[in-house]
Amino acid sequence: MKVAVLGAAGGIGQALALLLKLQLPAGTDLALYDIAPVTPGVAVDVSHIPTAVNVKGFSGEDPTPALEGADVVLISAGVARKPGMDRSDLFNINAGIVRGLIEKVAITCPKACVGIITNPVNTTVAIAAEVLKKAGVYDKRKLFGVTTLDVLRSETFVAELKGLNVSRTSVPVIGGHSGVTILPLLSQVQYAKWNEDEIEPLAKRIQNAGTEVVNAKAGGGSATLSMAQAAARFARSLVKGLSGETVVECTYVEGDGKYARFFSQPVRLGKEGVEEILPIGPLSNFEQQALENMLPTLRADIELGEKFING
């Protein structure tokens, strides 16, 4: 099994490289790529950690050597948010970066499962899909927007608020990966009783948690460490699924189009990537209303990505 990280010298990428070196199954090959010349050094650095994960680093304009034979590709390349920016401000730079990398994936490892971390995820996943489609290699079971950080944040905040064991707290998060499109299904959390006045502030905190980090870092970056852990968790789940285990994660995928072309919801992962898209389950009145309210935003984000490739 080979996992490639594109954007491995960045804030998310370096932390992700460390976590994958520690957490991937023994015998996995880990390829780290970034345009930055420091990348082979990042690989040497993490290679000194005593785990049975084999690491190689690649830098320069062409990611092809890192992608050869990859089963899983994680893309975190791009610019990060700064105070005053929202995820859509990143679009102009990151859209082109994702397009270029996916063009290489389409040629070098078209059957790989691809996890998009680069924001704005609502849009960059649509870009990736259209590039793969133009190349004639698109398989919707193998393209994912990594929305796991919304799940991690929800689990953390719910457990804190309700005094629950965080390791046993599970919160499905549906929709997209920015602002109002992030919808934590708090009504489905086991052992949590909610007052009406708790739900909206908590949902808003989860939606705006990325901005909370950007502001707290005072211009020094965005959520890199928690995002790296979220991406590592998702990568581990993908690897387990590809190895034949049954794993369920919330992730942003192309499904039946009931709500939008791409939509984050619980997905059963398996040997082909997406094995089954699971139902979102019963919603509270608040959640139903929030879902209806977000859909125009989500659909517009997706359309932006499609138009970027197709004009």
From Swiss-Prot:
The gene is mdh. It catalyses: (S)-malate + NAD(+) = oxaloacetate + NADH + H(+). Gene3D superfamilies: Lactate dehydrogenase/glycoside hydrolase, family 4, C-terminal, NAD(P)-binding Rossmann-like Domain. It is an enzyme of class 1 (oxidoreductase). It comes from the Bacteria. GO terms for biological process: malate metabolic process; tricarboxylic acid cycle. NAD(+) binds at residues 7-13, 34, 94, 117-119, 227. Catalyzes the reversible oxidation of malate to oxaloacetate. Homodimer. This is Malate dehydrogenase. PANTHER family: MALATE AND LACTATE DEHYDROGENASE, MALATE DEHYDROGENASE, MITOCHONDRIAL. GO terms for cellular component: cytoplasm. The active site is at 177 (proton acceptor). Keywords: NAD, Oxidoreductase, Tricarboxylic acid cycle. Substrate binds at residues 81, 87, 119, 153. Belongs to the LDH/MDH superfamily. MDH type 1 family. Its EC number is 1.1.1.37. GO terms for molecular function: L-malate dehydrogenase (NAD+) activity.
